[in-house]
Amino acid sequence: VGENWRDVLAMMKQSFDENLLLPENSPLRYIAVGECGLDFYWSREFEREQLLAFEEQVKWSVEYKLPLMIHCRKAQNEMLHILKAYEKELPGGVFHCFTGNQKEAEAFLRFDKFCLGIGGVSTFKSSHLREDLPASVPLNRIVLETDSPYMAPVPYRGQRNESAFIGQVLHTLAESYGISNEEMAEVTNENVCRVFPVYAHFKANCKL
């Protein structure tokens, strides 16, 4: 038993409309659209459906002025093509689990209200992020992620990832940028509060 993807999108759209009726301070209010995006890593069998669904969700982000949480794997050109059509209207968001190179980072950062989400991969011995990020990405364009339960950072690699492991990512990036853990935490917390405006109301408690 399944649902046609168009029907699923229609139900999700209805949910967004209904959510707007909640008080602004309600803990049930949505804070973002996503995780959504494109993933052609395994197959392009449903490429058309993915493209249409992603663009529809980008439109929701614009309509409801909610940031996007974007997943993109082996689909960068297609994703950028869609986003460019709405570039001036996009409220911002996060390119989730970024593991790309300097050129890819620069392509993503053209969307000036977005940040790159950096997770456990940055701690892997084989990762180039420790060199590429300081060379091409300003600190105010980074947020920290775990991608729990996946991608556990060193020294927990191979285990189930936990939110508590975010400190390993923070320490790795602080060393890469040549700043203290405290400075990295402060900047990335500020970035989260900027990208997700709902957190600005809780700024004093916006700590890792």
Residue ranges and their predicted role:
Residues 1-208:
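Mid-domain alpha/beta scaffold segments of enzyme catalytic cores
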